[in-house]
C-alpha cells in the first residue's frame, strides 16, 4: 500500500485495478479533477483523499460523534481556521510555484472545505466569495500566504481562513481551530494547542443548555483507516462518500479560481 501524491499516479493506479488514497489536495486543476472522476467512474475503483485535519484529528472525530448524537441540535454554521508554519528553510522549490502547489485554497484549505461539508451533513456546497494574497513574502511571488472563503449549502453557511503566518513562538505548526454552531449549542475545537491554557492537543469545548463542558479527545479512536480498508474489501463507502470526496476538492478549486480572477500569479 502506498499514499499517492500525483494525479497521474492516481489515474494509472485505478486503470491498473487499484483503489487509491491520495495525499491532499489530490489534484490542482479542474482538468485533473475531471480526469480522475472519469477514470474512477469507468473503473469502479475507490478514490480517496486523506483530509488529515479531519480524519487524523481525534477532536474532529469526536465532534462528529457528538453532532450525530444531537448534542448541539442542527448545524447552521462552521468557522474553520487552518494557520500553518512556513519554515522557509525546509520547503522545496515547487512549494513556491503556483502552478505546482495549486494555490493556498486548493492546497491547505481543502481540509476546511471537506470539514464544512461533513459537519453540515452535505455532499456539496457553494463558494460565495474567496480571496488570496501574498502579504508578507514579496521575495516569493508565487506563494500565496493567506486566503479565505465564504461557503454555504441550502441549510448552512461557513467561513474558511488559511495562512502561513504561524509565529515561531508557537510550540506547534499551527493553532488549528474549528467552531461549529448548532441550534442548541456550539462546539469549539482547539486541535493542536490550547494557547496558554490546557496542555497537549485535541481539546473540545461544548456549550449547551446545561453549561460548558470540556473533553480531552486525545484517546478517541480514529476510524478512517479501518473504515477505508473495509471499503476496499467490501466495496462500500463508510470512510468517506465518493461524492463528498470529489466535491470538497471541487469547492477548493472553485474558491481558488474565484480568488484569482483579475490577478496574475508568478508561475
Region annotations inferred by a language model:
Residues 114-194, 224-235:
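Contiguous beta-strand/loop segments that form the cofactor/metal-binding neighborhood of enzyme cores
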Residues 4, 26-88:
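A contiguous active-site-proximal alpha/beta segment in oxidoreductase catalytic domains
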Residues 215-226:
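Active-site loop of classical SDR/Rossmann-like NAD(P)-dependent oxidoreductases
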Residues 56-80, 106-135, 147-157, 258:
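Oxidoreductase and adenylate-handling cofactor-binding alpha/beta cores
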Residues 50-58, 87-125, 142-145, 244-245:
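Mid-domain beta-loop-alpha active-site segment that forms a flexible
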Residues 16-18, 43-46, 156-157:
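A short helix->loop->beta-strand "cap" motif at the edges of active sites that frequently abuts
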Residues 5-23:
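Rossmann-fold NAD(P) dinucleotide-binding segment
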Amino acid at each position: 500500500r502506498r499514499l499517492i501524491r500525483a494525479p497521474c499516479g492516481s489515474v494509472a493506479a485505478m486503470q491498473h485495478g487499484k483503489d487509491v488514497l491520495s495525499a491532499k489536495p489530490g489534484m490542482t486543476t479542474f482538468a485533473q479533477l475531471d480526469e480522475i472522476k472519469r477514470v474512477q467512474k469507468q473503473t469502479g475503483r475507490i478514490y480517496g483523499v486523506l483530509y488529515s485535519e479531519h480524519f487524523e484529528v481525534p477532536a474532529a472525530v469526536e465532534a462528529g460523534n457528538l453532532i450525530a448524537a444531537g448534542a448541539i441540535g442542527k448545524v447552521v454554521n462552521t468557522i474553520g481556521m487552518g494557520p500553518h508554519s512556513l519554515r522557509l528553510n525546509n520547503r522545496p522549490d515547487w512549494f513556491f510555484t503556483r502552478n505546482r502547489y495549486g494555490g493556498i485554497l486548493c492546497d491547505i484549505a481543502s481540509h476546511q472545505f471537506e470539514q464544512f461539508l461533513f459537519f453540515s451533513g452535505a455532499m456539496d456546497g457553494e463558494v460565495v466569495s474567496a480571496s488570496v494574497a501574498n502579504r508578507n513574502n514579496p521575495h516569493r511571488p508565487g506563494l500565496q500566504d493567506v486566503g479565505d472563503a465564504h461557503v454555504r449549502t441550502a441549510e448552512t453557511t461557513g467561513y474558511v481562513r488559511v495562512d502561513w503566518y504561524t509565529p515561531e513562538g508557537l510550540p506547534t505548526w499551527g493553532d488549528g481551530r474549528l467552531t461549529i454552531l448548532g441550534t442548541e449549542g456550539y462546539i469549539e475545537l482547539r486541535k493542536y494547542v490550547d494557547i496558554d491554557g490546557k496542555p497537549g492537543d485535541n481539546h473540545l469545548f461544548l456549550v449547551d443548555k446545561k453549561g460548558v463542558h470540556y473533553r480531552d479527545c486525545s484517546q478517541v479512536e480514529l476510524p478512517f483507516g479501518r473504515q477505508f480498508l473495509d471499503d476496499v474489501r467490501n466495496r462500500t463507502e463508510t470512510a468517506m462518500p465518493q461524492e463528498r470526496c470529489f466535491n470538497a476538492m471541487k469547492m477548493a478549486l472553485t474558491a481558488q479560481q474565484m480568488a484569482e480572477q483579475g490577478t496574475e500569479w508568478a508561475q
